[in-house]
């Protein structure tokens, strides 16, 4: 069942995979909007309204089901990919501040899961809004966001790191099935911090880090769960990440999942003010510039910059489980859930 959940979840936002035909609308290519090909025109208009941009302000890419198949067939069976592509994203590379993520109508994956996994793919600084006109699970959003970033910057991310990021999302998703999204993200993210920060290569040392992080956060893991995390972190350690490149993102996720939003203290205040002034000088903070009224009421939301948004919008640890099951539901319903 857990494998079925993860496979289904990988598909939910897979339309973000950006090998589809690009339709540049202006010379400014640093911002990219992706729209699922199987959305109606009204739904596409709704997403543009939610992103609060006009078509002449961004580069727009239409993502097809074939794009999903090209990029996801290595991870999930074709019969589970389905035939519809509906999810959307808005991506803006930035110069500093780490990875900032906001989600809407994604009821399984959270902003923190996306942010910490995206850092593994080699992205350093970026603003991301991942959304859909109606609720889907959203784990597959990572793949498309990676590709959107490449399109926006004109630079290719390292293929090994992208694969590790996808694996990280799968491992975290499986763990979330068993211990909850917040605890799963905490163990993965905080263990990754220590491995990268201290350049830990020894497998036994990595094992001890995972065990200690789990114990410190009162997360009960069995040996199989621990070993899967250790194996992934061993591969991540071999990539020799520069901690300064991922620090802002990983420490923000740590802060969010710990529930202590004052933890970073005054040390980062001056830097944060500079970051905000620099990246939002044009008034184009895409995370806080969305128009929620476009999606109507009862939106499931999360934001790395506003951890309370998950609770306020009703995104709980149990949300999404029923949405992901492929058992005993009709084909049209299944396609709607995984697209």
Positions of PLM-derived features:
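Signal peptide-directed extracytoplasmic domains
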Residues: 70-125
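C-terminal low-complexity, Ser/Thr- and acidic/Pro-rich disordered "stalk" regions positioned immediately N-terminal
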Residues: 264-326
């Amino acid at each position: 069942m857990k494998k079925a959940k993860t496979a289904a979840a990988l598909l939910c936002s897979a339309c973000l995979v950006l090998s589809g035909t690009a339709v540049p609308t202006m010379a400014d290519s640093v911002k990219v909007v992706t729209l699922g090909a199987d959305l109606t025109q009204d739904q596409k208009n709704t997403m543009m309204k939610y992103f609060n941009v006009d078509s002449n302000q961004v580069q727009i890419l239409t993502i097809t089901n074939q794009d999903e198949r090209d990029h996801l067939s290595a991870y999930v069976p074709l019969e589970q990919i389905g035939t519809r592509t509906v999810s959307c994203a808005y991506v803006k590379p930035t110069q500093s501040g780490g990875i900032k993520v906001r989600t809407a109508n994604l009821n399984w994956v959270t902003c923190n899961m996306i942010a910490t996994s995206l850092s593994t793919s080699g992205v350093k600084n970026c603003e991301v809004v991942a959304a859909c006109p109606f609720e889907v699970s959203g784990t597959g959003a990572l793949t498309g966001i990676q590709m959107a970033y490449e399109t926006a910057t004109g630079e290719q991310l390292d293929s090994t790191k992208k694969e590790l990021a996808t694996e990280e999302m799968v491992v975290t998703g499986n763990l979330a099935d068993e211990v909850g999204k917040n605890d799963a993200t905490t163990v993965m993210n905080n263990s990754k911090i220590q491995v990268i920060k201290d350049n830990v290569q020894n497998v036994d040392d990595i094992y001890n880090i995972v065990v200690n992080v789990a114990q410190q956060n009162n997360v009960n893991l069995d040996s199989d769960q621990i070993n899967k995390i250790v194996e992934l972190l061993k591969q991540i350690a071999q990539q020799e990440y520069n901690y300064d490149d991922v620090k802002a993102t990983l420490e923000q996720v740590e802060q969010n999942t710990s529930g202590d939003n004052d933890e970073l203290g005054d040390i980062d205040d001056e830097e944060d003010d500079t970051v905000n002034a620099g990246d939002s000088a044009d008034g184009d903070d895409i995370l806080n510039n969305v128009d929620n009224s476009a999606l109507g009421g009862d939106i499931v939301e999360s934001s790395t910059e506003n951890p309370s948004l998950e609770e306020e919008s009703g995104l709980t640890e149990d949300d999404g489980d029923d949405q992901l099951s492929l058992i005993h539901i009709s084909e049209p319903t299944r396609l709607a859930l995984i697209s």
